[in-house]
């Protein structure tokens, strides 16, 4: 079992990156990013102290707000904090819903950080590999490549 000290010393491989990672690493990138969002809150880190890649992913929060609306996001975040709920990550069907889903997952784990809830609970959100289908990986890579150049 991971202790708070282990979590505080966690290594985030993509956090300082200024370029897109390989296609093979994109699932790890999204999983790590969502975990990192909890980590920066729990350990009072500077969320802006990251590379361009994470800064682009942080912008997905705004996509989530436009896509769902702030009231719906607050409702989802609160519901996810009150029990073992599950977000169906297979309901993503276009670029905007993909980015909004990544944004809302990050907002949920960030909120858990404020409530001192472990990011390991993220597994209850759903399997990140359900979200990162081949089509969604392609969408994300093409978008990030444009932003990183």
From Swiss-Prot:
Expression triggers: Expressed in the early phase of the viral replicative cycle.
Biological process terms in GO annotation: symbiont-mediated suppression of host innate immune response; symbiont-mediated suppression of host NF-kappaB cascade
GO cellular component, one term: host cell cytoplasm
Swiss-Prot/TrEMBL keywords: Host cytoplasm, Host-virus interaction, Inhibition of host innate immune response by virus, Inhibition of host NF-kappa-B by virus, Inhibition of host RLR pathway by virus, Viral immunoevasion
KW Iron (keyword) present: no
Compartment annotation: Host cytoplasm
Alphabetical list of InterPro entries matching this protein: Orthopox_K7, Poxvirus_Bcl-2-like, Poxvirus_sf
Pfam families to which the protein is assigned, alphabetical: Poxv_Bcl-2-like
Keyword check for Cell cycle: no
Stated family: Belongs to the orthopoxvirus OPG044 family.
Subunit structure comment from the entry: Interacts with DDX3; this interaction inhibits DDX3 and suppresses DDX3-mediated IFN-beta promoter induction. Interacts with TRAF6 and IRAK2; these interactions suppress TLR-dependent NF-KappaB activation.
Protein role: Virulence factor that affects the acute immune response to infection. Bcl-2-like protein which, through its interaction with the DEAD box RNA helicase DDX3X/DDX3, prevents TBK1/IKKepsilon-mediated IRF3 activation. Contributes to virulence by binding to the host TRAF6 and IRAK2 and preventing host NF-kappa-B activation.
Protein name: Protein K7
Annotated organism of origin: Monkeypox virus
Name of encoding gene: OPG044
């Amino acid at each position: 079992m991971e202790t708070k000290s282990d979590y505080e010393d966690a290594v985030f491989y993509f956090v300082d990156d200024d370029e897109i990672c390989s296609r093979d690493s994109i699932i790890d990138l999204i999983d790590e990013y969502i975990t990192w969002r909890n980590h920066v809150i729990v350990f009072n880190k500077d969320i802006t102290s990251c590379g361009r890649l994470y800064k682009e992913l942080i912008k997905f929060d705004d996509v989530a707000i436009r896509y769902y609306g702030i009231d719906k996001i607050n409702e989802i975040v609160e519901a996810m904090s009150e029990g073992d709920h599950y977000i169906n990550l297979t309901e993503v069907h276009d670029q905007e819903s993909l980015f909004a889903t990544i944004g809302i997952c990050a907002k949920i784990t960030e909120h858990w950080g404020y409530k001192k809830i472990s990011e390991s609970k993220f597994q209850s959100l759903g399997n990140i590999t359900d979200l990162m289908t081949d089509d969604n990986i392609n969408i994300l890579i093409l978008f990030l490549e444009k932003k990183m150049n």
